[in-house]
């Protein structure tokens, strides 16, 4: 049996915060605002995984009102989501993610993002796609007010 999920997330860019994507601290003058480390890519992926399992969304499992999650690494939260997936007898078929950001250029970091996500998802690198794009200076991403991300996942029963 196959299950498919889609995820979407947005975080504002602000001064004084790190820019973390797939667990990588990317040098930039601004970072993402959020209760946790605000890793928009990993949040999107977790939302897609939870959706594929019909388990609700990220906020249901890790509410921003819970102090246990303040500043937490989203990669640690992804480990918890993977436990839910494994408990239900599913594994990753493949994932496809896209990040929309005007700056910084993310292409140099994509190989490490893929490796980090593949390791956390307990899957082969060939099952993990991460892409980055600009919005040609259009919208909030283009004005460098925030970064958005989308992901789709295919889960397989094992």
Curated annotation (Swiss-Prot):
Binding residues for a divalent metal cation: 9, 11, 43
Group of enzyme by EC: lyase
Documented EC number(s): 4.6.1.12
Keyword annotations: Isoprene biosynthesis, Lyase, Metal-binding
SUPFAM superfamilies: IpsF-like
GO term, biological process aspect, one: terpenoid biosynthetic process
Cofactor(s) this protein requires: a divalent metal cation
Gene Ontology MF terms in the entry: 2-C-methyl-D-erythritol 2,4-cyclodiphosphate synthase activity; metal ion binding
InterPro entries: MECDP_synthase (IPR003526), MECDP_synthase_CS (IPR020555), MECDP_synthase_sf (IPR036571)
Pathway: Isoprenoid biosynthesis; isopentenyl diphosphate biosynthesis via DXP pathway; isopentenyl diphosphate from 1-deoxy-D-xylulose 5-phosphate: step 4/6
Residues that bind 4-CDP-2-C-methyl-D-erythritol 2-phosphate: 9-11, 35-36, 57-59, 62-66, 133-136, 140, 143
Site (Transition state stabilizer): 35, 134
Catalytic activity: 4-CDP-2-C-methyl-D-erythritol 2-phosphate = 2-C-methyl-D-erythritol 2,4-cyclic diphosphate + CMP
Stated role: Involved in the biosynthesis of isopentenyl diphosphate (IPP) and dimethylallyl diphosphate (DMAPP), two major building blocks of isoprenoid compounds. Catalyzes the conversion of 4-diphosphocytidyl-2-C-methyl-D-erythritol 2-phosphate (CDP-ME2P) to 2-C-methyl-D-erythritol 2,4-cyclodiphosphate (ME-CPP) with a corresponding release of cytidine 5-monophosphate (CMP).
Oligomeric form and interacting partners: Homotrimer.
Family of the protein in this entry: Belongs to the IspF family.
Protein name (record): 2-C-methyl-D-erythritol 2,4-cyclodiphosphate synthase
Record lineage: Bacteria, Bacillati, Bacillota, Clostridia, Eubacteriales
